[in-house]
Amino acid sequence: MSTSDSLFAGSIPEVYDRYLVPLIFEVPARDLVRRLMRDEPKHVLETAAGTGVLTRELALQLPASTRIVATDLNQAMLDHAATRLTSPDRITWLAADALALPFEDHSFDAVACQFGAMFFPDKSRGYREARRVLRPGGTFVFNVWDRITENEFANVVTQALATVFPDDPPTFLARKPHGYYDAAEIRQHLTVAGFASIDADTLTAISTAPSARDVAMAYCQGTPLRTEIEARDRSRLEDATQRSADALARKFGSGAIEGRIQAHVITASR
């Protein structure tokens, strides 16, 4: 995996949280928490926490006595996440690699990961670590995006950028966030990691945004797609963003727009 594929630094965390989180992450976060609440966990680990959208939902919905440890590979994302919570006492923030978790065996009742597994360079190793830190009977709940053609905004942005850089189209969105969607492959990785009880559902929702420009900002400047654009021509970031916005407006209209998002939600028990 290219280092830039998992690097959320510089201005990316702020733009990500401002534009991308409300666009595509809030509904799936609430869905994950609903699934976790069924088992009433007392100690929850979150991996790949990003700017804390799932963390905030966990803190809001789970009992005050539930302890939450939120980890991410990128310290910049955690730093931004910590500024968004007004009652941080129950949450521990820790920069940690999901493939090498710094916790003892059987430390948590539940492990949650929102849209992070796609970035694991070794999927089974990441799942094996989640299983290792789970107590017997514990639950690992995570989601991954479906293929890019089932996620309309991301698909239009990717197509638009191919016209900006026809000789070397940026492929980050199709390759990473939307590149790990095969249910059989996911199940195989979990089985190799030692999970035996595995369930998978598909979550479909409608994403809304105040404008096409907001969506273009979310993807072009709030994800590592920005790094791909700038690697091709740093001076064309604004042009690439605007070309994406124009393509979105042509397809979805002016003013507020909406488009389909789709993800797979997986529950695996230890």
Please identify what each model-predicted range represents.
Residues 5, 13, 51-53, 176-270:
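Conserved Class I S-adenosyl-L-methionine
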Residues 109-124, 146:
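A short SAM/SAH-binding and catalytic strip from SAM-dependent methyltransferases
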Residues 45, 107-115, 263:
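Short SAM/SAH-binding signature in class I
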Residues 124-125, 132-210, 226:
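Conserved catalytic/acceptor-binding region of the Class I
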Residues 22-42, 57:
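Conserved alpha-helix/loop element of class I SAM-dependent methyltransferases that forms part
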Residues 10-23:
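Class I SAM-dependent methyltransferase Rossmann-like catalytic core
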Residues 43-101, 110, 125:
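Class I SAM-dependent methyltransferase SAM/SAH-binding core
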